[in-house]
Amino acid sequence: MSDKIRTLQGRVVSDKMEKSIVVAIERFVKHPIYGKFIKRTTKLHVHDENNDSNIGDIVEISECRPISKTKSWTLVRVVEKAIL
């Protein structure tokens, strides 16, 4: 197992909680029989200490120690702000 911290990029889909956001991570998976690439989405709860992000922002997150029952990721930076 590597000691490198996992980082991912995703889109903020909810920012209604205090110091927390929900980020959707999209990935493509090849169908085992037909070979077609299918889009799969994973929603992660992320700790946002300063409430920096809004809905629609592209953010970079990294894995950390468990902060609560569902939060074990933290916000690194906002890559791109959403166009309102």
UniProtKB/Swiss-Prot annotation:
Highest taxon of source: Bacteria
Gene3D superfamilies: Nucleic acid-binding proteins
Transport keyword on record: no
A Gene Ontology term for the protein's cellular component: cytosolic small ribosomal subunit
Annotated InterPro entries: NA-bd_OB-fold (IPR012340), Ribosomal_uS17 (IPR000266), Ribosomal_uS17_bact/chlr (IPR019984), Ribosomal_uS17_CS (IPR019979)
Entry keyword set: Ribonucleoprotein, Ribosomal protein, RNA-binding, rRNA-binding
One example of a Gene Ontology biological process annotation: translation
Positions of transmembrane segments: none
UniProt-listed SUPFAM superfamilies: Nucleic acid-binding proteins
Pfam families hit by this protein: Ribosomal_S17
Listed PROSITE patterns: RIBOSOMAL_S17
An example molecular function term from Gene Ontology annotations: rRNA binding
Entry's family note: Belongs to the universal ribosomal protein uS17 family.
HAMAP family: Ribosomal_uS17_B
Annotated function: One of the primary rRNA binding proteins, it binds specifically to the 5'-end of 16S ribosomal RNA.
Record text on subunit structure and interactions: Part of the 30S ribosomal subunit.
Identification of the protein by name: Small ribosomal subunit protein uS17
Naturally occurring in which organism (per UniProt): Sodalis glossinidius (strain morsitans)
Classification of source organism: Bacteria, Pseudomonadati, Pseudomonadota, Gammaproteobacteria, Enterobacterales
Gene field: rpsQ
